């Protein structure tokens, strides 16, 4: 009896070719495809997996689990890698790895294969996650092992009658889920080349956006958006709704050259309409609900959390601790944020919360002012004392300095 390998199958070029390649190596292939909100026709994926030679294909709807247990932390933690990338691909990898391990254990497979290249981040994310969940499972990386160029891979697919929706003229590599869409390869590899419109799918070009703005009210409960204009949604449905609405206005296009885990720079074209709107709104709500010290310290944790996730360390003691901290900051991050959507921009026009720390009577300069300005004199004396002592003992600073 042949040994079984579970393959993370997407229906794309890399994993379709990987099925045939693993068969040639003497394995039975168990394909596994997760739906994490990418809108893919999974019936077609299922059929393609079997047509290319897999003995089984498991289709798993993990959209709600993805939104509730993974994307929720991206929102509460304002997670952005290098202040640009909302981490949607990185967010899905630990969940995919978790499901692959479950299928491998159920089917008595000896290992797990993925379609990642040897120069990308995902090979690390998958294999480290698999080691964390079940160290006894072997990891297989066909694309890394065969080391073909994109053109050679396409030729192999054509030779073996593997149906793939890709050609030499438009060799994009696309990854998409509920939280966003990533596009690379082809002309996009030139960081100076303007991305053509066919590189985008979720967002309109500015020239095609409406000339009238939409204004919405996002309601949050403990850091998670739960309503749009008073209508309650599950998180996954809310994100999909915002993707359509914000994408219509051209919101969420990101052109970024990022520093990959493996040490190279990579030009990526991202689309994240809902993510841009939600994260802007969430940050705005935090400005009135977090204390000053938490508001100043939390970005340090957010940066570390984003790097943990980007670097494939979701299943780690540090990430567990970071999640606990993020959760602790969100107890009072509830309220409404008003946002204007127009011509590629998500503009925060207002925010309110039953837990607001903003006291208008303390902030106002009108006759309603309740701030005791006399207290400022003593505060300045104490606050400035170290500076004053330094000036007295060391001569202070000259005007030239």
Swiss-Prot record:
Gene3D superfamilies: Argininosuccinate synthetase, chain A, domain 2, HUPs, Single helix bin. GO terms for cellular component: cytoplasm. GO terms for biological process: argininosuccinate metabolic process; L-arginine biosynthetic process; urea cycle. L-citrulline binds at residues 85, 121, 125, 173, 258, 270. GO terms for molecular function: argininosuccinate synthase activity; ATP binding. Its EC number is 6.3.4.5. It is found in: Cytoplasm. It is an enzyme of class 6 (ligase). Pathway: Amino-acid biosynthesis; L-arginine biosynthesis; L-arginine from L-ornithine and carbamoyl phosphate: step 2/3. Keywords: Amino-acid biosynthesis, Arginine biosynthesis, ATP-binding, Cytoplasm, Ligase, Nucleotide-binding. ATP binds at residues 8-16, 115. InterPro entries: Arginosuc_syn_C, Arginosuc_syn_N, Arginosuc_synth, Arginosuc_synth_CS, Arginosuc_synth_type_1_subfam, AS_cat/multimer_dom_body, Rossmann-like_a/b/a_fold. It catalyses: L-citrulline + L-aspartate + ATP = 2-(N(omega)-L-arginino)succinate + AMP + diphosphate + H(+). L-aspartate binds at residues 117, 121-122. It comes from the Bacteria. Homotetramer. Belongs to the argininosuccinate synthase family. Type 1 subfamily. NCBIfam families: argG, PRK00509.1. HAMAP family: Arg_succ_synth_type1 (MF_00005). This is Argininosuccinate synthase. The gene is argG.
């Amino acid at each position: 009896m042949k040994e079984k390998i579970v393959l993370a199958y997407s229906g794309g070029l890399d994993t379709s070719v990987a099925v045939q390649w693993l068969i040639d190596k003497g394995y039975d292939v168990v394909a596994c495809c997760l739906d994490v909100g990418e809108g893919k026709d999974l019936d077609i994926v299922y059929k393609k997996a079997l047509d290319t030679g897999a003995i089984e294909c498991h289709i798993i709807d993990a959209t709600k689990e993805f939104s509730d247990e993974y994307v929720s932390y991206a929102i509460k933690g304002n997670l952005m890698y290098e202040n640009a990338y909302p981490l949607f691909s990185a967010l899905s990898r630990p969940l995919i790895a978790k499901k692959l391990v479950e299928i491998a254990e159920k089917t008595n497979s000896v290992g797990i294969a993925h379609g990642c290249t040897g120069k990308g981040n995902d090979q690390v994310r998958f294999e480290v996650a698999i080691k964390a969940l079940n160290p006894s499972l072997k990891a297989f990386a066909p694309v890394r092992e065969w080391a073909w160029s994109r053109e050679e891979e396409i030729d192999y697919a054509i030779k073996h009658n593997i149906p793939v929706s890709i050609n030499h003229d438009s060799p994009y590599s696309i990854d998409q889920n509920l939280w966003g869409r990533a596009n690379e390869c082809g002309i996009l590899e030139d960081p100076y080349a303007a991305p053509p419109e066919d590189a985008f799918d979720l967002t309109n070009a500015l020239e095609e956006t409406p000339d009238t703005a939409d204004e919405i009210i996002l309601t949050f409960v403990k850091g998670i958006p739960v309503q749009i204009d008073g209508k309650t949604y599950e998180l996954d449905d809310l994100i999909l709704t915002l993707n359509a609405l914000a994408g219509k206005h051209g919101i969420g296009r990101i052109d970024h050259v990022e520093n990959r885990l493996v040490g190279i720079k990579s030009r990526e074209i991202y689309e994240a309409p809902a993510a841009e709107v939600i994260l802007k709104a969430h940050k705005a709500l935090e400005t009135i609900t977090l204390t000053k010290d938490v508001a100043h310290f939390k970005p340090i944790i957010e940066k570390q959390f984003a790097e943990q996730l980007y670097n494939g360390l979701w299943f780690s003691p540090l990430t567990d601790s970071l999640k606990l901290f993020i959760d602790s900051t969100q107890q009072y991050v509830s309220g409404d944020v008003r946002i204007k959507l127009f011509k590629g921009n998500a503009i925060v026009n207002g925010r309110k919360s039953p837990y607001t720390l903003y006291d208008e009577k303390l902030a106002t300069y009108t006759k309603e002012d309740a701030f005791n300005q006399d207290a400022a004199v003593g505060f300045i004396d104490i606050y400035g004392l170290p500076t004053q002592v330094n000036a007295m003992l060391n001569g202070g600073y000259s005007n030239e300095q």
